[in-house]
Amino acid sequence: MEKKWWHKTVGYQIYPKSFQDTNGDGIGDLKGVIRHLDKIEKLGANVIWLCPVFASPMVDNGYDISDYMDIDPSFGTMEDMKELIAEAKKRGIRILMDLVVNHSSDRHAWFQAALKDPFGKYGKYYVFREGKDGKEPNNWRSIFGGSAWEKVPGYDNLYYLHIFTKEQPDLNWENPKLREEIYEMILKWMDLGLGGFRLDAISHLKKNYQYTNLPPDGPDEYNMAFE
């Protein structure tokens, strides 16, 4: 079998927030990464795995994305990102971005629209369900503790699914329209010259939506449905 480039590459992971600050605000930025590309090249790395830099409220260190086509201002601008991609390419280095598509931020435009109309187009981009017997739809526990369901403001018995924090509503991968949006976003980044993505929480995309309670595995009567 012919090996692809990613089978024989050397990667260098960067957590931008603590890498290098170039503007004195105490937070590392994309310009700081650009400044060190020559050193990274000398190390023999030909891939940089960039931890989250997408626009985000930073509830979960950037793994709560509010805009898939923008950079968080704390790290710089889209122009900085384009420059990083271009400068890295000159040195034979590909940039991989950390991408989360199991969920978005609750500040994302899709979810804001979904809250206004949970049964409309964007409501179907997420997972909304009615509660049962005055409780959540089922006893699934969030990975961060507590129920994986959060009540929708303005509704007496409607909840949305979040297997991480309540500020990270799960995307509905059973919806082909949602999948198309994600694929289009990925292609836009590839057109900008991005080398690819490291997909976070990818094992959680497929879920069993039978919505039945599971045997409680703790005193809170919830069950860790997601490993």
Question: Which residues does each predicted region cover?
Answer:
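Active-site and adjacent substrate-binding regions of carbohydrate-active enzymes
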Residues: M1-E227
